[in-house]
Amino acid sequence: ASQQRQVAARIVQRVFPMSNDVRVKAALDVAARADISDAELTVVSQAANTARVESFTQCGKETDWSAQAGHFVAKAAVACVGAATPGSNLAWDAAMQARMARTCETVATGEGTENREAEEQYRILEAFLNN
């Protein structure tokens, strides 16, 4: 689970600027470390989940794509520090939420939905595995 968290944190750090929530940042900082305790995981997981819930309420009835992007970044951070259960894939879950964040950002900026997030995620994974 430690390697899953480390890769997930690297992937989500690419989209973190869409959130800028200190609780999300704390979750990513903890997930990026190999030496995290269960107590640390519990604290940052709860904080990241609170950020996720709050970001969802900020999205509003009229879709604000930038707020939606921030919500997906928070969901990605929650995946980074979530409980590792049999069959779970923390890095995959975080990567999918990061892709959703990037898609929302491109819609918000009028760039459409084309982006290279998946390619960048594979590059990050390859770099991690080669170290």
Located regions from the model:
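Structured binding/interaction patches within domain cores
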Residues: 1-131
